[in-house]
Amino acid sequence: LWSCYTSRLSDEESADYLCKTCAPSPGLDVFFPAGGDPGDLRADEFFKRCEKVKEELQKQFPNVKLWPSAQAPHEYPDWGECFKREMAKLPEEIDGVIYGPNHPFTLDEMRRSIDPKYEIRYYPDVCHNVRCEIPVHFDRDDWHYAYAATLSREAINPRPSEYRLVHRLTRQYVCGSVSYSEGVNDDVKKFIYSDLDFDPNCDIRETLRDYARCFLPGFDPEKIADIIFGLEQNWIGDPAENSSVDNVYNLLLSLKNDAVLENWRFVLLLFRASCDKVVRDRRIFELGLIDDAATKIRKGEIEAAREILAEEYPQSYKELRGSLFPLAERLNRLIGMQLDVEHFGGMNVERGCTLDTIDIPVTDRQYLFKKLNEHPDREYLTDILDRNKVERDEFYFSFAEHGFEVIGRQNGEFYMNFVGDDNTDGSMPMCMTKVYDHFNFDCKVAGLTGGDYELRITYKSRPNDKIIHHKITFNGDVLYDGPQFGGRRDGDYEKKYLVGGYQSIVYDVPSRFFVNGCADIEITEPIDGFMFSEFRLTKKR
């Protein structure tokens, strides 16, 4: 039994509530209270609550075991350390511990810190795609912004190979997992993870064949396995460059008939494949428009550029986009799936309401169109087009456009905050749609042979007067160490290139900070961390 605690109830009231809730049950084996997500008790209070609840539950269920989850409320930075101190007391009431989302420490740190008499059970997040414990491509966090914006946090998400990797990375620390779900969007992953728990060496392709035999009878199990693996492949790289999207969609169309459209699992796969193709086709079309419009802008033909950017989608795209609602209607009838708020009663657009997010911008078409209408000026618009261009001996990096392959994997458990699904009006350029949130950042840059430079960072505003050591070093030498951000703020740049809630901060970097044109740049802040979406090193002019 999973449950959460709140400070609104006393220990006695909480125990009474849970005992009454469990009273009709013929048995209760394990009680699994979450420390946070949700929950708002301090760690020591959480342990006292756990002990009281177990004491009362044992009156009805003498053999019930207590497995508290080390999920930390965000308001207590020291919650994790306090949890470890409580566990160091070797409490007899506790039989094991759970490791789940919103954890205050890594799984390795948890296992090292807690006596081996307490087994750890994993509570993996199989549901979510972004802003979560295991984001798409969690080992590199490079899910393309076009998908992250349009499919969002709870889209249909079979990721068999990736969750096999999750299982391999965690299984040596844990005694198993607690399979859970918040819907049917993660239907395939539940079977994959449960099968891996049963046999860590199982062939996941055979798991998918079994899935097909059980739930999609009459189809070639190999084809269904190929489709599911293909949906995972669809999410690799830029959708405009990924032909897997077309292949998977066409394969599903070849299997489609009236009878199979009554099978919700088939419709689930078809809906996801159709969404992927909508994103790919729209992105290809719009990138072509942007290229054509850019040519006109550079020639000063502003009105011609406007007409190009306003061009309608082709009929084939309109028909494809129009096919989504009938599929969503069918899924709602068959399984109660809620793919939008208005028609199907979804809680909010982030909770799997793909129909509400599928039309969010996937290119800078709308952004450029807005800029063109606001400033129909050749020079201004050329600057917008060249926003991210730098010289050969300069450097520009965007988390959204470039990913960690360019700068290397970061230390610790950073948080990648995707903000593109808020960009419904196209006011934000795509290069700003991913915001890195952590206490440290490190990257190596070379080829900086132009003398003195300027470092320009686009920070997300999060004012904190307590910060006194926002620190930037180049090759180990301190460039800045002081209150939050430091440097000098460039309001003109912000007005022209950024959106509200972001700051452009510039730091002077004299040539002595470079070693033969190379720089090992490190940013640290130990209290609240920092958030930024992009940076550039340009020659001082």
Predicted regions and their residues:
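Poly-acidic low-complexity segments
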Residues: 146-151, 157-159, 203, 241, ...
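Extracytoplasmic
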Residues: 368-541
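Catalytic-core regions of glycoside hydrolase
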Residues: 2-219, 314-329, 333
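C-terminal non-catalytic alpha-helical accessory regions
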Residues: 181-189, 201-388
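Surface-exposed beta-strand edges and their flanking turn/coil or helix-capping segments
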Residues: 46, 81, 111-112, 133-137, ...
